[in-house]
């Protein structure tokens, strides 16, 4: 994918007095009283917005929240305004809509360095359909476009892709730039030895990532529920562990492909098993080949943690996507937490450590080690598609550097 123009390349002359349409990702979790339970995504958007404010732009922010079907008050962006205002140090105004006369009036009133937040763009079905007329209406509000919403870059929506056709320059924000530098850079020309750790419950959702990474990595470590499909493919009994029966041949072919490519593919040698899927289940550690009937594997075992740790000690670049076990249950969180601690330790020794979105981000935050990693990706699906080597519509639409 070509290198894209970044907002950092735009100077005062390009920005002062200009109306800038910024697509951010403010899709944060809210509790039943509409309090923000995790403001990571809002904080991640701040550097780009502040840069535009400091250079005298009139800033127009657009985002989605959740998956509303039409106008749904519980998905309004209004609860985000106090936190956003606090982080930016200005009073952010919010519109009741994202297009139309009222919005145009509010845009005209934004002072230099001021910020207007549009209401949830997904209140219009035209947003997800990427309808040109809707994209044109959004674009008509501004002079130039900045996309800083990496988390939705894999979607060709009106505010992520359509708008870029009608506004020039169309550039990447700082967050988008950092995501691309790390994720594209790591996959295109990593410092070797390069290891990937892939976890999660299903092989099916990670096939593309595993196949793509097998072309690039020296070491591939597998954990999470997907390992039982690999064990069964090797003829092991897996008790009542999660298995995708229709993916057994695929698991075999991935192991063969790794061998042919000289990739060291490591599966856990032992697992923590449970007599039921629950936080208070009885548990014990057994070798991977000896899971008894009626028991299910819910985490990687202590030997696996040791051998994974040793394999990672020799690396220069590590990408991690997906937990090693059911880390939501403390009893089955040791594997995931051990990997997080190992990566934090390696970061301290100069290894590039990239947490590739999704549940692994939550896991790293749970153990309080987020700050220690080289890069934590904010995109779930977008990170996966990028690691699979797929082009992202929201990135392709931006100007080349």
From Swiss-Prot:
CDP binds at residues 200, 224, 322, 327. GO terms for cellular component: cytosol. It comes from Nicotiana tabacum. AMP binds at residues 202, 206, 225, 297, 328. ATP binds at residues 206, 225, 297, 328, 359-360. Monomer. Belongs to the phosphoglycerate kinase family. This is Phosphoglycerate kinase, cytosolic. PROSITE patterns: PGLYCERATE_KINASE (PS00111).
């Amino acid at each position: 994918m070509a290198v894209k123009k970044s907002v950092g390349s735009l100077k005062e002359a390009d920005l002062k007095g200009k109306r800038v349409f910024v697509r951010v990702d403010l899709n944060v979790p809210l509790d039943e009283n509409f309090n923000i339970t995790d403001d990571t995504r809002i904080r991640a958007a701040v550097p780009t917005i502040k840069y535009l404010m400091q250079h005298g732009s009139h800033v127009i922010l657009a985002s989605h929240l959740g998956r509303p079907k039409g106008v749904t008050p519980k998905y309004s962006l209004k609860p985000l305004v106090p936190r956003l205002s606090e982080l930016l140090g200005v009073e952010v105004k919010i519109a009741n809509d994202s297009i139309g006369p009222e919005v145009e009036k509010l845009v005209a009133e934004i002072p230099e360095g001021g910020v207007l937040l549009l209401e949830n763009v997904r209140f219009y079905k035209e947003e997800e359909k990427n309808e040109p007329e809707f994209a044109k209406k959004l674009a008509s509000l501004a002079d130039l476009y900045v996309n800083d919403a990496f988390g939705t870059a894999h979607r060709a929506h009106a505010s992520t892709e359509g708008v870029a056709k009608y506004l020039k320059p169309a550039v990447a924000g700082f967050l988008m730039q950092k995501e691309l530098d790390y994720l594209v850079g790591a996959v295109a020309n990593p410092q070797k030895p390069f290891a990937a750790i892939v976890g999660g419950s299903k092989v099916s959702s990670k096939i593309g990532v595993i196949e793509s990474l097998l072309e690039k990595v020296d070491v591939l470590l597998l954990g999470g529920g997907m390992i039982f499909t690999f064990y069964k493919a090797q003829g092991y009994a897996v008790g009542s562990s999660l298995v995708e029966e229709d993916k057994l041949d695929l698991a075999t072919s991935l192991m063969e492909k790794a061998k042919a490519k000289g990739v060291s593919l490591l599966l856990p040698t032992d697992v923590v098993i449970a007599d039921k899927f629950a936080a208070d289940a009885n548990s014990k550690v057994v070798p991977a080949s000896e899971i008894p009937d009626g028991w299910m594997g819910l985490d990687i075992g202590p030997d696996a943690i040791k051998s994974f740790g040793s394999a990672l000690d020799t690396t220069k670049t590590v990408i991690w996507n997906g937990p090693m076990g059911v880390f939501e249950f403390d009893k089955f969180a040791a594997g995931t937490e051990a990997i997080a601690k190992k990566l934090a330790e390696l970061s301290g020794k100069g290894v590039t450590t990239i947490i590739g979105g999704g549940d692994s981000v939550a896991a790293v935050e749970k153990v309080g080690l987020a700050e220690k990693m080289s890069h934590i990706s904010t995109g779930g699906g977008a990170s996966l598609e990028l690691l699979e080597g797929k082009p992202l519509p929201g990135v392709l639409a931006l100007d080349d550097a």
